[in-house]
Curated annotation (Swiss-Prot):
Domain of life of the native organism: Archaea
TM annotation in the entry: 37-57
Compartment annotation: Cell membrane
A GO BP annotation: protein secretion
InterPro entries assigned: Prot_translocase_SecE_dom_sf (IPR023391), Translocase_Sec61-g (IPR008158), Translocase_SecE/Sec61-g (IPR001901)
One Gene Ontology term of the molecular function aspect: protein transmembrane transporter activity
Protein name from the UniProt record: Protein translocase subunit SecE
Record Gene3D superfamilies: Preprotein translocase SecE subunit
Family the UniProt entry places it in: Belongs to the SecE/SEC61-gamma family.
A GO cellular component annotation in the UniProt record: plasma membrane
Keyword set, alphabetical order: Cell membrane, Membrane, Protein transport, Translocation, Transmembrane, Transmembrane helix, Transport
Known function: Essential subunit of the Sec protein translocation channel SecYEG. Clamps together the 2 halves of SecY. May contact the channel plug during translocation.
Subunit structure: Component of the Sec protein translocase complex. Heterotrimer consisting of SecY (alpha), SecG (beta) and SecE (gamma) subunits. The heterotrimers can form oligomers, although 1 heterotrimer is thought to be able to translocate proteins. Interacts with the ribosome. May interact with SecDF, and other proteins may be involved.
Amino acid sequence: MSTYEELISLLRDCKRVLRAARKPTWDEYIESAKIAGLGILIVGGVGFLIRVIVQLIELYT
């Protein structure tokens, strides 16, 4: 398959996906924001705990 044919195939696939997609509702946006925010808080909390543990280890060694 040539590069041109691969590009045409990719564009067809993208077009098909975009046709099937729909704009999310406001409630779906809010739900996604809550989930993303929770994920950010969890990752930040884990990072904070690791930093505190490392500082405590350095303090007592």
